[in-house]
């Protein structure tokens, strides 16, 4: 299931990039071309350029969100594996140093456990996880 969320964040980033590359720039080029051929100067095209940058900023937000999802998942997995490692290497139940280190990682361990035990939480996003047929 975690693989599906990583895949989702990857597809979200790819979608944001494709939107900028395939949609924003061609529309901008077309509008600027029409404006210049109709006699407007580049200074007159500020509104067109402003719309381009607004569209790019919106798409970059999606890409940043995708990166944050991926970063969060990787952090949770890292902390969970460290938690399990600390617990496995405890000398005894009263090893306070190990317990202190494990306690710091316990929150992410619990979050991952709840996430994996929910089972159907990915049903809401099922449409995003379908294989991409190119």
What residue spans do the PLM features occupy?
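Extended, charge-rich low-complexity regions and/or helical-solenoid scaffolds
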Residues: 1-134
